[in-house]
């Protein structure tokens, strides 16, 4: 990959990994937002220290997203956040998930709370595809190009259009 080309970073939970569907199933609810904060914390407590993140299913769009990004940039990287209160363990199991579920493998896998530090590298505006609006906002404030995409709500055309728009802006 050319050093002047952007790195496309893919978030895991909500983009490649069906964290929220699996979480709702674990909690025995249709949607995680149906839980009050106490019940939500109780389910999160069950995850802490476990291999939960290694066993999650792919989203239906996972492989198509990886393929689309490789067609666009030649490669991709993972940029995901660890679970608060279980950073070391959740990081280990997210890395295991990447090794077991993604092919071809990403160039790099970064698990960190503050994603925005990767928005600009060597003067290049990098791309983040993430389901959280707050992450996209911080990414764009740091100079990166953000694409808000939620696998259980959005069509793949959201990513396709955004990548085409990025290319038009840079040409």
Give a label for each model feature.
Residues 53-58, 62-92, 98:
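Substrate-recognition element of Asp-dependent hydrolases with the DxDx(T/V) motif
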Residues 1-50, 141:
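Active-site neighborhood of HAD-like aspartate-dependent phosphohydrolases
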Residues 7, 109-139:
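Conserved Lys-Pro-Asp/Glu-containing loop-to-beta segment of HAD-superfamily phosphomonoesterases
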Residues 94-110, 165-170:
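Structural recognition of alpha->loop->beta junctions
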């Amino acid at each position: 990959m050319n050093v002047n080309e952007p790195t496309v970073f893919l978030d895991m939970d909500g983009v490649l990994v069906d964290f929220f569907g699996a979480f709702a199933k674990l909690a025995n609810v249709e949607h995680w937002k149906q839980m009050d904060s106490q019940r939500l914390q109780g389910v999160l407590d069950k995850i802490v220290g476990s291999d939960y993140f290694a066993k999650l299913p792919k989203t239906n769009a996972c492989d198509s997203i990886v393929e689309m990004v490789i067609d666009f940039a030649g490669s991709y990287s993972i940029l995901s956040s660890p679970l608060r209160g279980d950073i070391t363990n959740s990081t280990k199991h997210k890395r295991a998930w990447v090794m077991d579920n993604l092919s071809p493998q990403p160039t790099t896998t970064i698990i960190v709370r503050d994603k925005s530090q990767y928005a600009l590298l060597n003067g290049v505006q990098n791309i983040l595809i993430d389901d959280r609006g707050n992450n996209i906002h911080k990414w764009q404030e740091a100079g990166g190009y953000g694409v808000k995409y939620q696998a259980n709500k959005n069509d793949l055309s959201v990513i396709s259009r955004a990548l085409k728009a990025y290319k038009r802006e840079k040409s």
